[in-house]
Amino acid sequence: MNMNSTDFACLVTKFLTEYLPHHRCYSKNTILSYRDTLKLFLRFLKEEKDISPNSIYIKDFKRELVIEFLEWYRNSGASISAANQRLAALKTFSDYAQLESIEYIAPLQSVSNIKAKKSSPKEVSFLTASQMSKLINRPDINTYTGFRHRVILTLMYDSGCRVQELCDITIADISLGSITTLRLHGKGNKYRTIVLSDATSKLIENYISRYRSYAVGTDYLITNRYHQKIDRDGISYIVKKYVDDIRKEDTAFPEHVHCHMFRHSKAMHMLEAGINVVYIRDFLGHEDISTTMVYVRADNRLKNEAINALAPKITNEVNLPDWNKDKDLLEFLNSLK
């Protein structure tokens, strides 16, 4: 740490490198999500307050500032639940800072006491099967970059993995064969093994033989253009690139497609195919089936909309008389006041 670092910078460093991993025993992925929240907070300070990361002190970390950050984040298009997750991370940091900077315990406690906003039942955003197919097949597999991007999009959908799980896949996690399996390192440091489709298996086999034949088991399956481990921002960029490309030709294609939407789409398509919700729970790596039930509710809502859409057609098929043809009756009805 630089000798000129502020107390805020020092606390952030200790929070991420000591407190979370060693005292709270949080997983690497959880720590990364906390890091991302703090990066967003610093970006907010720079863009909205013209405060550089090197100029903020722990005494400046106040309730009003955090609330402004959350409003800025919501205005960027984030959901209430996403904002609540960011708030939870900042409150954990505030709790830690109280232990280290007791002289600022009062303003820090006011941050910890910010209440999360209540959100309506979560709406599941997903692509239809045809939309997903269009997106996955967009990259040009005749180039190395396009082939790599095709693998990323295909694997993210077919495995239903979280984006960080995709980043963490190593060569050893893939077991190619008549039935190809993939081992995923999920939340809570838990692993699950899933079966991939034959088409995805063939794509990965070709990708490894063409571009990753030199790789050993501990090497990452997906790398960035610098042949380093790809990160979540890199995958988000790839998704946006092809969505924007499609929308140049098809403005009806959804504009806001995020990485987690691949996971939502896979779950919805499995449900539509009649796959048991318990299997979907295990496939997605949900600890509690209530988390998976959000897809069941969404599927029921779609079915209800389909039924309602058919209702006018059924009514229109009934041979009701055309009262306009009976001028006398129409005049009589119009004369009633």
What is each of the regions a protein language model found here?
Residues 1-337:
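Conserved catalytic core of the tyrosine transesterase superfamily
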